Amino acid sequence: AAVHYVVNEDAEHLKELLFSIESLWMHFNERFDYPVLIFHDGLSPKTRESIVAKTPGQRIWFFSVGNWVPSEAQHALHSNFGAGYMAQSRFRSGPVFHHEALDGFDYLWSLDSDSHFPAPVDVDPFLQLHSNPELVIG
């Protein structure tokens, strides 16, 4: 099992991500130690270093997914949504599950850059899924 994010180099999203990753570590992953996979469209080395430095004990792996921002024509069809949101939604709807980074993982917890944990998580959700097949659909 693993936790994953999809991010870009946007300053506001990175600020949220740093808060989220610290919250994930403090309230969940320091105890359960699942890898954190960050799919991105070109994070700079400096940005990646700052993300890893935020929680030095956490296993964070970065994977480039190329340019997944929709074309102007595609964006015009769905003008109520930002291009970045559309791209993340499209990637998470299927392609993420075929990415080689997920080989060997049975479960994936998808978090947004603005996700956070306000309190400790005392139960391992992945262990719960493994131990109770009625919780799993599919």
What are these model-predicted stretches?
Residues 117-138:
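Conserved donor-nucleotide/metal-binding helix-loop-beta segment in metal-dependent transferases, i.e.
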Residues 103-118:
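Short beta-strand-to-loop acidic/aromatic patch adjacent to the donor-nucleotide binding site
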Residues 47, 51-106:
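Active-site-proximal specificity loops/subdomain of glycosyltransferases
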